């Protein structure tokens, strides 16, 4: 039974197929003017790199099914003069490769001239037009300050190259119209003034390479008869049709006139930041490959090494940054950027939550450690009070200041019990029975219980034996006066009444903490000290039970 289109089974089957099926590789989309490699990490290369004799794609698909033309010349790292094979007036683009790291290409678009200069591959020279009006000699000094001179020409191709260039620059124009006149490096010397002016062209500055000389010039309308040397002006046209047909003329003008001028200098190494590089230094040539590193040799980049960058992940259309190596700009539609922003937001939220949880855990650990420390101190204080039994005094213990060494000092919460007032053992682990520490027994144990309640036992001072004697073992027989007549009359305190129970006597004895001494017989006025008790003998000594 085939499930219906709107059934849940069909939907689950469709989702299962989408999950199991391997996603197809997105179609490569290269910009116009680029060749799409069939495979590998390199997907798009410039179209002129196809069939140039050197494979660029990893699968060498750019060199497949290519006719052999011989126009592309691969060169190795060996001693190769990069100027070999150059023909003046020919194709200015050449491809050179170096067997170091990745293949490298050289062409006329690589910066060999500073900004504002036009490079001509035929003579390896750079040209620039200065539109500021100066006389001939000032113009020559300006060209010398930029390591050049007023332009001269060695071939017709070089002259055509200069005439075909667009010299419009953001500078103040001097007398700019559809035609222009430029000071160049020639001078016309007058040799005779018979029927007409006769003379010849000469190079204004000695030391210039072999050049061709212009044809007969057009003289200025106003000429001084005293002038024997005139300076050359090249007249060219700004209109594109006339310029492309190489229309020009030569004029002999007074050297004091002000005009624009054309400077010429040898090509030089220029880095990607438009800085001139000296001979023998490493630099990144000016161009569209910021990952190229070369050595400057005779104004050209040689011994170059290029870095191969990995294509950006998650981006189908991208463009290289012309100023920074291995930096790309994604050209995908805005949809991917929306997902990227959402992913960035989710990462930010997850980071905030993780940071909050970690901080909370740290705070809880600090609080728990402080709580355990407080509980430990409280347990130490409670154990101290329990061991010393400050609420009730124990019989037989000495509570004087020397009883415990330094006495009892209050234990504060700041005292952790280590090296402070008291010395305690570490607290026991949790969930175990607490073991009380061993206590040292006193040297003099307390008297037994029977001795403490025996009325016959007395404490006496041996030094008082001369004045007192111990009481006889048996009490005298009572007389008519009863028990009170049998007791010595010099004692102030009477005995406890007969009806007092033994338990009350024990309680009174336990609560007593002072040693009672007999009063001074001299202070008693009721009975004379010389009165002898009945029965004869010495005066009996007063005795009371003393219990600590």
From Swiss-Prot:
Q: What's an example GO cellular component term for this entry?
A: membrane
Q: Where in the cell is it found?
A: Membrane
* Keyword vocabulary terms for this entry: Cell adhesion, Disulfide bond, Glycoprotein, Lectin, Membrane, Phosphoprotein, Receptor, Signal, Transmembrane, Transmembrane helix
| Membrane topology of the entry | Single-pass type I membrane protein
Which residues belong to any copy of the C-type lectin domain? 113-239
Which coarse location class describes where this protein primarily resides? membrane
Signal sequence span is: 1-24
Q: Which residues cross the membrane?
A: 348-366
Tissue specificity is: Ubiquitous in various organs with low abundance.
Which residues does the UniProt record annotate as the domain VWFC?
268-331
Disulfide linkages recorded for this protein, renumbered to the chain, are 30-44, 37-57, 51-66, 143-263, 236-255
Which GO MF terms are attached to this record? carbohydrate binding
> What is a biological process (GO) this protein takes part in?
response to xenobiotic stimulus
Q: Which Gene3D superfamilies does the record match to this protein?
A: Low-density Lipoprotein Receptor, Mannose-Binding Protein A, subunit A
For the Extracellular compartment, the record's topological domain ranges are 25-347
In this chain the LDL-receptor class A domain maps to 28-68
Q: State which ranges are Cytoplasmic (membrane side).
A: 367-548
- Region: Disordered; residue ranges are 415-548
Q: Cite the PANTHER family for this sequence.
A: INTEGRAL MEMBRANE PROTEIN DGCR2/IDD (PTHR15256), INTEGRAL MEMBRANE PROTEIN DGCR2_IDD (PTHR15256:SF6)
Role: Probably plays a role in neural crest cell migration. May play a role in delivery of extracellular signals.
Q: What is this protein called?
A: Integral membrane protein DGCR2/IDD
Name of the gene encoding the protein in the UniProt record: Dgcr2
């Amino acid at each position: 039974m085939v499930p219906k289109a709107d059934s849940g089974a069909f939907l689950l089957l469709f989702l299962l197929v989408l999950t199991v099926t391997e996603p197809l590789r997105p179609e490569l989309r290269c910009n116009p003017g680029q060749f799409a490699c069939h495979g590998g990490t390199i997907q798009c290369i410039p179209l002129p790199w196809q069939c140039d004799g050197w494979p660029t794609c990893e699968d060498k698909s750019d060199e497949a099914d290519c006719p052999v033309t011989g126009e592309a010349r691969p060169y190795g790292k060996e001693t190769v003069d990069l100027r070999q094979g150059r023909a003046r007036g020919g194709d200015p683009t050449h491809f050179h490769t170096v067997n170091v790291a990745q293949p490298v290409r050289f062409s006329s678009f690589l910066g060999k001239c500073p900004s504002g200069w036009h490079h001509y591959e035929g003579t390896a020279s750079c040209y620039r037009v200065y539109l500021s009006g100066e006389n001939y000699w000032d113009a020559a000094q300006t060209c010398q300050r930029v390591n050049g001179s007023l332009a001269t020409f060695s071939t017709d191709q070089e002259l055509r190259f200069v005439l075909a260039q667009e010299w419009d620059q953001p500078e103040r124009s001097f007398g700019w119209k559809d035609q222009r006149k430029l000071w160049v490096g020639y001078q016309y010397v007058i040799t005779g003034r018979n029927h007409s002016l006769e003379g010849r062209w000469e190079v204004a500055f000695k030391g210039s390479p072999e050049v061709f000389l212009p044809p007969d010039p057009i003289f200025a309308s106003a000429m001084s008869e005293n002038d024997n040397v005139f300076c050359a002006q090249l007249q060219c046209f700004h209109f594109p049709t006339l310029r492309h047909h190489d229309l020009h003329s030569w004029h002999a003008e007074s050297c004091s006139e002000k005009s624009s001028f054309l400077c010429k200098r040898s090509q030089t190494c220029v880095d990607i930041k438009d800085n001139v590089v000296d001979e023998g230094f490493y630099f990144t040539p000016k161009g569209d490959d910021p990952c190229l590193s070369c050595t400057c040799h005779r104004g050209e980049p040689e011994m170059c090494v290029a870095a191969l960058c990995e294509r950006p992940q998650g981006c189908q259309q991208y463009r290289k940054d012309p100023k920074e190596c291995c930096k790309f700009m994604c050209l995908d539609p805005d949809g991917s950027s929306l997902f990227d922003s959402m992913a960035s937001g989710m990462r930010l939220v997850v980071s905030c939550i993780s940071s909050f949880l970690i901080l909370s855990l740290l705070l809880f650990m600090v609080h728990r450690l402080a709580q355990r420390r407080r509980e430990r101190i409280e347990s130490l204080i409670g154990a101290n009070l329990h061991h010393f039994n400050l609420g009730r005094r124990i019989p037989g213990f000495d509570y004087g200041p020397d009883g415990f060494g330094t006495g009892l000092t209050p234990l504060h919460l700041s005292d952790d019990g280590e090296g402070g007032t008291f010395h305690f053992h570490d607290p026991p682990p949790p969930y175990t029975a607490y073991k009380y520490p061993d206590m040292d027994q006193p040297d003099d144990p307390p008297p037994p219980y029977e001795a403490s309640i025996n009325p016959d036992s007395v404490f006496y001072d041996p030094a008082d034996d001369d004045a007192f004697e111990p009481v006889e073992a048996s009490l005298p027989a009572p007389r008519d006066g009863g028990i009170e007549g049998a007791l010595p009359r010099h004692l102030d305190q009477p005995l406890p009444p007969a009806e007092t129970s033994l338990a009350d006597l024990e309680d009174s004895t336990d609560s007593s903490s002072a040693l009672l001494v007999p009063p001074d017989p001299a202070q008693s006025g009721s009975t004379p000290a010389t009165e002898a008790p009945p029965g004869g003998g010495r005066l009996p000594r007063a005795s009371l039970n003393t219990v600590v």
